[in-house]
Amino acid sequence: LLITSAAFIYAYSDNPYFTITKKDVSVKFPAYFPKPVYAFENNKPTPAGFVLGRMLFYDPILSRDSSTSCASCHQRFAAFAHIDHALSHGINGLIGKRNVPAIQNMIWQSSFMWDGAVNHLEQQPLAPITNPVEMDNELITLMNKLQVISQWFTYLL
């Protein structure tokens, strides 16, 4: 899933470089932009994917106790960074080791996290979801949780 990038692009869907229709998503970049690192042909953007990304980004269901969403730390008004605290706050009020990076222009990045520990955009969301200080969830538990809720089932097929 392109959770973070889909949420970001969907949030700015009125941008003339992104066109979303019922059947298609087209992404056009100005000629002077560098080529994206992310390979869209391996996971083509779809309208349903953008909706799913936005829903997942803002819904706290991704955290173990459904208290913390991606947007809890990646605040839209702050370029999807976190400016309210020096260190990020996660599940149960736990304090992280660093602040969250902004999540803009991610399709041009080859590594993620402050230390570059993740090197693929599709793998990046797994780090905070499974981190015990951030969202503290297990992927199998999360998938089971999402499949029970009918609003998610349509997008997960």
Descriptions of predicted regions:
Residues T4-L157:
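Periplasmic c-type cytochrome electron-transfer domains
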